[in-house]
Amino acid sequence: MPVFRAVLFDFFGTLTCSVQRGTAHRSTAELLGCPVDALVDVLDRSYYQRASGRFGDAVATLRWVCAQAGVHPPESALRAAVASRRRAVHADTRLRDDAVPVLTALRAAGVRTGLVSDCTHELPEFLPQLAVAPLLDVRVFSVQLGRCKPDPALYLSACGPLGLAPRDCLYVGDGGSQELTGARRAGMTAVRLAAPDLAGHMVFNAEPAWDGPELGSLSDVLDLVGPVALPACRPDATVGPVALPA
């Protein structure tokens, strides 16, 4: 019998490798007639406002960003830039090699899976194209809920559709947005993914003082749920439950 009945994952830096803005974002800036540095500055300082959907849909949000950067592109350019930005964020997204095997193993063991992500409009648009999409029983996006981590509403919004109490859920994240403290306060057990590639990860509002358990790889999640076997890459590995500190 699994120790936890569900595992909820952060997305960027957890199910994905470390994220940095790639060169594709330059195309978005060019479409808007905006210097790249000015665009990035507004994007960075407005992240939580945008991730909570404060400015409306993707076009309205980018229009607000442009105004803050001092440019006022026509509607056609805004719409083209929204599509360009979606492609750029998608291009920045590389799933971890063990993301699909881990989710597959959890579901095969009867453990529910979910996504709880602080994100802007792009992720809900392209997530259905990713291999992890059919392996997630519930998806909670801050931009749709109107709240960001560490607000307990995000975590509890995942519990409801699963029909589970927070204590039945394990939360896994890299620690951005104070998400681990938020999950713990919501009544979940939280663990930090401390994979080596995250040293250069683009993160907002990290929690370096996290004193809870950490994992070196996403596959280590299975050691906390057990007994679960990871398919293909670890065919003989069946692990038992591991006790976590309260």
Q: Locations of the language-model features?
A:
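Asp-based, Mg2+/Mn2+-dependent phosphohydrolase catalytic module
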Residues: M1-F9, L31-C34, S76, V100, ...
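N-terminal helical cap/lid subdomain that shapes the substrate entry/recognition surface
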Residues: M1-P101, A109, H121, E125
